[in-house]
Design a protein with these regions (language model features):
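N-terminal hydrophobic targeting/anchoring segments and the immediately downstream early-domain regions
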Residues: 1-16, 28
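Catalytic-core regions of glycoside hydrolase
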Residues: 4-5, 22, 27-69, 75-287
Length: 287
């Protein structure tokens, strides 16, 4: 719900939220502020101009969907002051989280590249298609010899700004992204290997949402290297409940998973909905 609620928060609001997290035992929050600054530096080193970078990086209100590979450039361009401001803000956020023993989850490298990366950089990419009419970023094929190079550059720039994390979120092919021509097993392994090269003890955090994560992409990954967030578990669980409209016969296989509840989708108020279902699904999952 980052872009529903938190897109324009300043340090005063984030400080309050992090204190609230600590008081309520939340120890694994998404920390994606300032990822646009990482991408700015990465693309600069790959030869993109400021204008080209801003054609790729989404505006403040749309960065959640950008980082889930759904769109690019929408809501931009961002002024230079925005990047500087968000980098400084993320440094304060991460510092406070770590002081409290909270593990930030940084956006990792999922294979995303600008839609024009084939023409600009000569990369072997696939086209994931459109998302609700928006052009998606391209997906860098795991067989491209520069996959490891670009992933390493991404993590290097992330580390420079915010240090290494032990958890990274990556959600390629989110909400119907086309996987035509993509070896999903190889893609999962390439994404995992790039993360592990950066930090051997890091864990990939993926959202279970609609068809993601694709079973073929995670089926041959080692147990313990991936945590799946069953994001809508109170309503459409994927852990293996046959009654669910998002039923997965084998759940998440060998991988650890977390029962999550979306409830209000961020910032909405009101007590309504399938209240009995909310309670029952949790205990059904525990069984």
């Amino acid at each position: 719900t980052f872009s529903y609620t938190m897109a324009f928060w300043d340090w005063t609001r984030w400080e309050k939220e992090i204190d609230w997290m600590a008081l309520h035992g939340i120890n694994l929050p998404l920390a994606m502020v300032g990822t646009d600054g990482v991408w700015y530096n990465v693309l600069s080193k790959l030869g993109y101009t400021k204008e080209e970078i801003n054609d790729f990086v989404a505006g403040p209100g749309f960065q959640a969907w950008w980082l889930m590979n759904n769109l690019e450039g929408w809501g931009g361009p961002n002024p230079d002051s925005w990047y500087k401001q968000q980098i400084a803000l993320q440094k304060r956020i991460v510092k406070r989280m770590r002081e409290y023993g909270i593990e930030p989850v940084f956006p990792g490298y999922s294979g995303m590249v600008p839609h024009n990366a084939k023409e600009k950089l000569g990369l072997n990419v696939s086209d994931p298609g459109l998302w609700n009419g928006y052009r998606r970023p391209a997906f860098l094929q795991p067989t491209d010899p520069r996959f490891e190079e670009i992933a390493s550059l991404y993590y290097k720039e992330m580390n420079k700004l915010y240090g290494k994390a032990d958890y990274y979120s990556m959600d390629p092919f989110h909400e119907g992204g086309s996987v035509a021509g993509v070896d999903l097993d190889a893609a999962g392994k390439a994404i995992m290997q790039a993360m592990k090269k950066n930090n051997p003890k890091a864990v990939w955090v993926a959202q279970a949402w609609q068809a993601n994560p694709r079973p073929q992409m995670i089926g041959n990954l080692e147990a313990g290297d991936l945590i799946v967030l069953d994001l809508f578990a109170e309503s459409r669980p994927q852990w293996g409940d046959p009654a669910s409209t998002w039923y997965r016969k084998d759940g998440f296989g060998q991988h650890d998973w977390i029962y999550c509840m979306l409830l209000n989708y961020g910032g909405n108020v009101g007590l309504h909905g399938k209240l009995k279902h909310v309670i029952d699904e949790f205990y059904k999952a525990k069984e």
